[in-house]
């Protein structure tokens, strides 16, 4: 799947444009 944030599965895009794990 492709998300707007461009992060890998299980990751969330933060306000500063980085990808952080949500687990």
UniProtKB/Swiss-Prot annotation:
Q: Which Pfam families does the entry link to?
A: GBP_PSP
The protein's superkingdom reads: Eukaryota
List where this protein forms a coiled coil: none
This protein's UniProt keywords:
Cytokine, Disulfide bond
Write out the tissue specificity statement of the associated record: Hemolymph.
* GO cellular component assignments: extracellular space
Q: List the disulfide bonds.
A: 7-19
Give this protein's Gene Ontology molecular function annotations: cytokine activity
* Entry's family note: Belongs to the GBP/PSP1/paralytic peptide family.
- Function text: Causes rapid, rigid paralysis when injected into Lepidopteran larvae. The physiological role may be to reduce hemolymph loss following injury and promote wound healing.
Q: Can you say what this protein is called?
A: Paralytic peptide 1
Which organism is this entry from? Answer: Manduca sexta (Tobacco hawkmoth)
Organism lineage: Eukaryota, Metazoa, Ecdysozoa, Arthropoda, Hexapoda
């Amino acid at each position: 799947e492709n998300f707007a944030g461009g992060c890998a599965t299980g990751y969330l895009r933060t306000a500063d444009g980085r990808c952080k794990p949500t687990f």
